Regions:
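Short polybasic amphipathic segments
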Residues: 56-60
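Alpha-helical subdomain
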Residues: 185, 210-217, 223, 238, ...
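Short Gly/aromatic-enriched secondary-structure transition segments
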Residues: 61-62, 74
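C-terminal substrate-binding/active-site "lid" region of AdoMet-derived donor-dependent transferases
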Residues: 3, 189-259
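SAM/dcSAM-binding transferase cores
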Residues: 2-14, 21-50, 65-71, 241-310
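A generic structural signal for alpha->beta connector loops
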Residues: 120-122, 146-148, 201, 228-230, ...
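A short, flexible beta-alpha/helix-coil linker loop
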Residues: 63-67, 176-179, 204, 211
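The AdoMet/dcAdoMet-binding core of the Class I SAM-like
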Residues: 37, 52, 71-196, 215, ...
Length: 310
């Protein structure tokens, strides 16, 4: 889970810092303190938000991955989580439980949100980094009354292939190795697995990141359109205009998406974004071809300084 910073305000392979065991026990302190631990994919750190009681930021090798508020799981800090939250809100009447598969766990921000806003939802989380998942469960536990959330360690695509057909209302792909989406989660073949897992009218959603000239985002939009008849792309206007690197949300379904409601929610958010669908999306995609496994590549790396924590 990676969020590109707004102008208004499974992770890296480089050498990880040394483990700091002295920070690896919150319960030893009256006040929350940072927790650091080496994981399979990098050095993970949980840092308390000094400005918000209960708020925690998860980083991996310095790249922001997730933000959770233990006191209020409905608080979504990052713009991409807010957009995914709006999408989930609009897919069904308020409070109706959903069956959701989360590919990519991070600190389980969205599973916590859906457990709070749609009690009774059955949610499965798949995270490739086992030590990271253990760190989050140890210090930011997500289990509680009404929270039917199971988390397992594994590869997102392999887990998706094992999901019973027609069993999910929503499949969310939010997988980053460092700051890049792995190639095997960007192809038509992968999208077909997601489509198979969904119930009729179910929705697939992916959090991605791209920058000028948006070649990756266009190719991913073409790929989703090759599998789903109804597709929308959501991003900040400056990202769509090719002015900067940022997060891109893609959603696809076999049923019409609530585009008008979604457009209103995205435009009115504290991080305003534009929804592109229909002919506008076709124009954006142009002649870009869908991506197959044979030519799939990781998403482009962010520019220097795009993801950083001081």
């Amino acid at each position: 889970m990676t969020s590109a910073p707004e102008e208004s305000d499974d992770r890296g392979e480089h050498d990880a810092p040394e483990q700091h065991d002295e920070h690896d026990a919150l319960e030893e302190h009256d006040e929350p303190v940072p927790v650091g631990r080496q994981t399979d994919l990098g050095f993970a750190k949980l840092m308390p938000d000094i400005d918000r009681d209960g708020g925690w930021l998860l980083t991996l090798d310095g790249t922001p991955q997730s933000y959770v508020d233990l006191a209020d799981p409905t608080h979504l800090e990052f713009e991409y989580t807010r957009r995914l939250g709006h999408l989930a809100d609009a897919l069904a009447p308020a409070g109706r439980p959903l069956d959701v598969l989360h590919l990519g766990g991070g600190a389980l921000t969205l599973p916590r949100y859906l457990a709070a806003t749609r009690p009774g939802s059955r949610q499965r989380v798949v995270e490739v980094d086992g030590p990271l998942l253990a760190l989050v469960e140890e210090h930011l536990p997500w289990r509680g009354p009404g929270a039917d959330v199971s988390a397992t360690v594994g590869d997102a695509r392999a887990a998706l292939a094992a999901i019973p057909a027609g069993s999910q209302d929503l499949v969310i792909a939010d997988v980053f190795h460092g700051s890049r989406t792995p190639a095997h989660l960007t192809s038509v073949e992968f999208l077909r697995l997601a489509a198979s897992a969904l119930r009729p009218g179910g929705c697939y959603a992916a959090n991605l990141a791209d920058g000028p000239p948006l070649a990756f985002a266009r190719a991913q939009a073409a790929t989703v359109r090759a599998v789903f008849p109804y597709v929308c792309l959501v991003a900040e206007a400056s990202v769509l205009r090719g002015r900067r690197y940022g997060n891109v949300l893609l959603a696809g379904s076999t049923a019409p998406l609530p585009e008008a409601e979604l457009a209103r929610l995205f435009a009115g958010d504290i991080f305003p974004a534009r929804l592109v669908a229909g002919e506008d999306l076709a124009s954006l995609v142009g002649r870009t071809a869908p991506v197959a496994d044979a030519e799939a590549t990781d998403s482009p790396p962010p520019p220097d300084g795009a993801f950083s924590v001081g």
